[in-house]
């Protein structure tokens, strides 16, 4: 009989263990709302669908964005400075909308629904742009190439154009931070194999983004530069529609997370509760309030108490008044917060200085879509009888990203891990390397421009190829920017996704997108300030319509100097940063994958 009970006990334990292995440990659910079965959901099957979706959507987006500055000058009749500013503002708006998408995703809709809705808006914007360009904007027929400018446009046509491109901005912006996080959701951090796959996913995600833009920067770019704008826009619309269809096909396979509700009240509760206990002195951590350690499957991991921002700990300090309220079941979240709530606020406060330091890098990155293109347009773009569209030079940026992702993952990271006996470079260290490479890119661009001016043809306003210097001299600056992206943007995606609370993962990805957004706005502001200061006393300024009369090289050197100052501040902030500490489903299980301090 004892043997029978022993066997029965072992069988029960094995069944419990098997059930635990069958389901993910991170609280993911399937499309029916049931706990996600590890073998039937997520992993690379779902992630590959998301990567292909990202590639197609990026193709569609850059089919518009990469040549937008030329569309504004050739079709809409804007000068170089205005066109560069408008592209920076539009690109900035794309990523500002990422905050809206992240908020709706984390709070109410969930990542899957948010991705589907904003992708639909994206498709509508592209179709609208294609139709309006064909019917209204490209008149006379065949205009918009380098030789035949288009005529003027009435107000309603201009309004329709801007409505179309800002619908594209809304759709792509709201979708981008959520698709990155949704892809990461397909891997369970509680499983060592899937945890490693999740880290690798972000590199492949950025690679998919660049591979998608490769077609835009070559084939579509060539068509559009030759005046075939409508064909390019329709190809982008078709690619976006295919991306949406493919995304929906993966619905049965995806892993989902329920939205955690609006985080703003939770944050406000911490500040209000701390303010109510302003005169209280917190001496012992064990008096801080933490809810039941065993949390429901659909809630995020609890965060462990950290030092720093000690005044916020007062919100979780249990006073005698709180004890009495708890006994009477009258305790309010506005008078007592959990340690996890407090740590969520601390987490965001610690991230902000790092995030602010990434904005100036995005100013450098923004030059590829504007001033790099205008600089290339003023160089010799002919190879034998073949004309190279200036925007297609960003192909070297894409190839650089692909090469450096491989070099980093396969060579550099393992080498550093063996040499330093660690897990390789941290995200913060990689972002610092990205800033160094960005400085080198601006110095390279400035030197090329200085050399281009020496070869420039004096007083050449309209002639083709206003400098005899080959456009291929731009290759180093594109390659350096591409290398910097691998360290900065991939590092950002991993860092912000890993260091934000479980209920704010899309917000973490949106921080990366918003950095790009503000970088474009700062770029636009910087160009305006530089032109206002430099274009005085009848001087043409640093960035005039005819670059041969300006000093674009000085602007690049200015950016290099500003980025150097930003690097110094970044290093100080990274050393100050403290990594978050999560607690798993088992209260004794604490994540130890990150060091305590930043650098």
Question: What is each PLM-predicted segment?
Answer:
Residues 2-144, 151-599:
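Hydrophobic transmembrane alpha-helices of multi-pass solute transporters/permeases
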